[in-house]
Amino acid sequence: MSITPQEALQRTIEHREIFHDEMLHLMRMIMRGELSPVMTAAIVTGLRVKKETIGEITAAAQVMRELSRKVAVADTTHLVDIVGTGGDGANTFNISTCAMFVAAAAGAKTAKHGGRGVSSKSGSADVMESLGVHIDLPPEAIARCIADTGIGFMFAPNHHPAMKNVAPVRKELGVRTLFNILGPLTNPAGAPNILMGVFHPDLVGIQVRALQRLGAEHALVVYGRDGMDEVSLGAATMVGELKNGEITEYEIHPEDFGLAMSSNRALKVETPEQSREMLLSVLRGEPGSAREIVCLNAGVALYAANVAATMADGIARARAALDSGAALARLEQLVARTRALAAGG
């Protein structure tokens, strides 16, 4: 079923849904650059104002997946993405990136999909680059990296070439749109398990249901009540969990895992270099709130990856991976492997 751009815009003005097949058609036109920048901007702004439905988000994500450059991972057992929508304004160091190394050292395979900082001081690509990781590998090299080190980093612009058709509109609008919530739904490696942080409480239920429709196996969508798009140490965290096809929604608290509640102020950074130093301090085993929040998020990721039976078990495994030096060693392996692959090795 097709819909004209003008009809779609009128629907958003009237706060009416664009149905699944219509959204597929509309999104393909947008991603192929068939609409003018003015019409694209009007439609994505209209969707934002009326609030995107689960069906609209799911259809848009399907099109982005369809047009992406995929990473073929042979064995997706324990494969997990740790990702956030961004836009929480917290400007913390790269917690999910640090948690990725810890989770990989504790038995998960991590396929992280990220880009440069837009709303934050340091995006995952910025800090990975500052750590010496080669982020511009082709899909087949990333698949080898996951097989060899348990970690693959997918630089989003390399895997979503069609995004170039909407990038100028996004930049000029300068506000959150549908595309901010699509990125975490479109992992090019098809990770069946995911820990996703979101920037608004309403997105917990929306994103976990979109993941359900998109075929995810074990997903946890989280929102820290202090505004963080991570599992938070500073407040309760809302959780939407998809497991065995069923969705449950609940809250978790740092105290549930024997962790002291603490402010996020000590986690803030101004530059990718500061984020790099804080991340390295955690991997080197230094104590403090940065270590605690990484253990918390890595532990939940290990639960999402079905490596740990419970979140508490995951946190214990995360601590052990840091204490043994295995997490730092995993970073060093990734740097060496990506450089070798970039050189053709």
Curated annotation (Swiss-Prot):
Its EC number is 2.4.2.18. Anthranilate 1 binds at G84. The keyword ATP-binding does not apply. GO terms for molecular function: anthranilate phosphoribosyltransferase activity; magnesium ion binding. Keywords: Amino-acid biosynthesis, Aromatic amino acid biosynthesis, Glycosyltransferase, Magnesium, Metal-binding, Transferase, Tryptophan biosynthesis. One of its GO terms (cellular component) is cytosol. It catalyses: N-(5-phospho-beta-D-ribosyl)anthranilate + diphosphate = 5-phospho-alpha-D-ribose 1-diphosphate + anthranilate. SUPFAM superfamilies: Nucleoside phosphorylase/phosphoribosyltransferase catalytic domain, Nucleoside phosphorylase/phosphoribosyltransferase N-terminal domain. Its cofactor is Mg(2+). It comes from the Bacteria. InterPro entries: Anthranilate_Pribosyl_Tfrase, Glycosyl_Trfase_fam3, Glycosyl_Trfase_fam3_N_dom, Glycosyl_Trfase_fam3_N_dom_sf, Nuc_phospho_transferase. Homodimer. HAMAP family: TrpD. Belongs to the anthranilate phosphoribosyltransferase family. This is Anthranilate phosphoribosyltransferase.
